[in-house]
Amino acid sequence: MIYQMQMPTKIDVDEATHTGSFGRFIAQPLERGYGVTLGNAMRRVLLASLPGTAITGIKIDGVFHEFSTIDGVREDVPEIVLNLKKVRFKSNCKRSCKTTLTLAGPKDFLAGDIVAQEGEFEVLNKDLHIATINSEATVTIDIYIGRGRGYVPAEENRSDGMPIGFIAIDSIYTPIKNVKLTVENTRVGQKTDYEKMILDVETDGSITPDDAISLAGKIINDHITFFANFSPTEEEFSEEEYKQLDDEFESMRKLLQTKIEDLDLSVRSHNCLRLAEIDSLGDLVSRREEELLNYKNFGKKSLTELKEQLEKFNLKFGMDITRYQLKG
């Protein structure tokens, strides 16, 4: 029999301080120690695991490396890059995009000047200063914007397909600006050794604190489910059943080694997978859907086509295939 532990009755929201970018959430009562246990897990997931949008790189006409200066612009390229890292976006776009700006001086280049060509995103901190352009200068800049999680260094934003002069930028995807955890004592009846967990969540405005808390909780729950469903009891199989399992294992292993070029796919999907270095069914099913949508020129039409192909083999995206020990 499992001892019945004290659980929170609900999550309270401090309405007096609640805004579109700040929320205080209170969970009580909790068993002693669980305020820190749950609070730290929520804090880490909020800060590092929520998806967001950020600039991944730029290309400025006439500039070929990141340590350059630009004629007619007060700031040098490293300073412009530092300012661009601070730009915050609200976006429903699931893949990367590019926007091109032509700026003629005299002008203060602000974050609000970064406009989506097809409405893919919206800049939140429009008044952020990027650069100062004098009266005789004209600057053309390509800005590359992507989706991701947490923090991605500039090195990982570089790829062979980028144009000459592309300058990769550290991407700060996380939409969470700060999370503060406070644990206090609370009472249940005559007992005073329970805990109250308080989470102060501040976002950049691209996601509400309520949605951030809900998404973080779902991410944690999805991981904990693996442990909750774990059973240490090993099933006993007959020799015939073991042989059947071995045959099924080898059959699946052979299927996962199937080359992408052997599948009945459109030329567009073939090219997208080739550029992403996805060569086999095993490579494909080990990817998540959101990963594929981040690849260049890979859209929902290609994703739907691939899902239909996988369904023919009773496969799906996001599979764990490590036990099949496929060669890279």
From Swiss-Prot:
Annotated region described as Alpha N-terminal domain (alpha-NTD), given as residue ranges: 1-231
UniProt organism field: Chlorobaculum tepidum (strain ATCC 49652 / DSM 12025 / NBRC 103806 / TLS)
Subunit structure: Homodimer. The RNAP catalytic core consists of 2 alpha, 1 beta, 1 beta' and 1 omega subunit. When a sigma factor is associated with the core the holoenzyme is formed, which can initiate transcription.
Domain notes: The N-terminal domain is essential for RNAP assembly and basal transcription, whereas the C-terminal domain is involved in interaction with transcriptional regulators and with upstream promoter elements.
Region feature Alpha C-terminal domain (alpha-CTD), mapped onto this chain: 247-328
CDD domains: RNAP_alpha_NTD (cd06928)
GO cellular component: cytoplasm; DNA-directed RNA polymerase complex
Name the record gives this protein: DNA-directed RNA polymerase subunit alpha
NCBIfam families referenced in this protein's UniProt entry, alphabetically: PRK05182.1-2, PRK05182.2-5, rpoA
Enzyme Commission designation: 2.7.7.6
Homology family: Belongs to the RNA polymerase alpha chain family.
GO biological process, one term: DNA-templated transcription
